């Protein structure tokens, strides 16, 4: 195999980016992605992202394979890295501010690279009905807000949000005390979530400042999750715990999230940085 790649990271959530613009099919298989993401015997990453040709009236298409070979609908930190990758491939100066329409399995997502190196992403509207998550915690046409869920021998109050991929959010007094390695898989594989679930544990420091830890479906514990931070802010607003705009602090650093009102899109702003280039 001789395939160029570039590694990017967004708040420590790291990805191998592949220039796939000349082929509509990913240049690597899910099985190859698992090997390449291995941090001991491969390059090491949370996932492999492919920049593919446009679909319909978009600029590019995004596909991603997680480190376990599964394919999520979307990845918030990943799409910021993809936008920075596209801008770099197109030869834009670091001060340029290109805006892209990216086709994903979750729909069209619109990131804009900013002159300060940050990327702001229009993540679209959150989906709140149980059938859209999906989850069996409530009837398909009802919202799942502060619903009890039995996990690990205790009852958790959970709120479910889809940002194109499924999230289960619970609010805790001390997020640092959560045994994520034990609870994460139990939430992810709970029978109430037929497509598995991303799980966010949130500590509300102030109405405009949330601390979060995440267990990602297919990737495990990561330093950051962009869609998870968006889902967390939405859940906090729905539970009257947060203002419409807040900083979500993750182990890898902060994201700025805004959801002005139900029916409106969620905006996410955060960094995306190139780490190194290589050849597989």
UniProtKB/Swiss-Prot annotation:
Its main location: cytoplasm. Pfam families: DAP_epimerase (PF01678). GO terms for cellular component: cytosol. The active site is at residues 75, 225. Substrate binds at residues 13, 66, 76-77, 165, 198, 216-217, 226-227. It catalyses: (2S,6S)-2,6-diaminopimelate = meso-2,6-diaminopimelate. Gene3D superfamilies: Diaminopimelate Epimerase, Chain A, domain 1 (3.10.310.10). Its EC number is 5.1.1.7. The keyword Transferase does not apply. The record marks 167, 216 as: Could be important to modulate the pK values of the two catalytic cysteine residues. Keywords: Amino-acid biosynthesis, Cytoplasm, Isomerase, Lysine biosynthesis. InterPro entries: DAP_epimerase_AS, DAP_epimerase_DapF. GO terms for molecular function: diaminopimelate epimerase activity. It is found in: Cytoplasm. GO terms for biological process: lysine biosynthetic process via diaminopimelate. Pathway: Amino-acid biosynthesis; L-lysine biosynthesis via DAP pathway; DL-2,6-diaminopimelate from LL-2,6-diaminopimelate: step 1/1. It comes from the Bacteria. Homodimer. Catalyzes the stereoinversion of LL-2,6-diaminopimelate (L,L-DAP) to meso-diaminopimelate (meso-DAP), a precursor of L-lysine and an essential component of the bacterial peptidoglycan. Belongs to the diaminopimelate epimerase family. This is Diaminopimelate epimerase. It comes from Cyanothece sp. (strain PCC 7425 / ATCC 29141). The lineage of its organism: Bacteria, Bacillati, Cyanobacteriota, Cyanophyceae, Gomontiellales.
